[in-house]
């Protein structure tokens, strides 16, 4: 994992996995919640497939993470959203 100063930089796939795991979901449960198959979701977490915007928004809503952070890895400034 790269770092920017003392802040580790995670890939989109790492952010997706960590968000899912912190929500207590396995890949199959997350896939069902966002309306895709488990194998498709697994390919997305592995970086073989790019997630669709709607999938990222759904993952953010389900896991409670900021959608901008999930998509970009950037923490929005206070008052930005």
Go through each PLM region and give its residues.
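Alpha-helical residues within the helix-turn-helix
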Residues: 21, 32, 61
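Residue-level signal for the short linker/turn that defines the boundary of a DNA-recognition helix
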Residues: 14, 24-25, 51-54
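A short, Lys/Arg-rich alpha-helix, primarily the initiator
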Residues: 1-22
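Recognition helix of helix-turn-helix/homeodomain-like DNA-binding domains
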Residues: 35-51
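Short, charged recognition helix plus adjacent turn
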Residues: 1-8, 61, 68-81
């Amino acid at each position: 994992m790269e770092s920017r100063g003392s802040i580790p930089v995670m890939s989109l796939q790492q952010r997706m996995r960590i968000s899912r795991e912190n929500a207590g979901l396995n890949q199959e449960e997350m896939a069902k919640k966002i309306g895709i198959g488990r194998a498709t979701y697994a390919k997305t977490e592995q970086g073989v497939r790019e997630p669709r915007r709607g999938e990222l928004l759904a993952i953010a809503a389900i896991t409670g993470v900021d959608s901008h952070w999930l998509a970009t890895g950037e923490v929005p400034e206070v008052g930005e959203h």
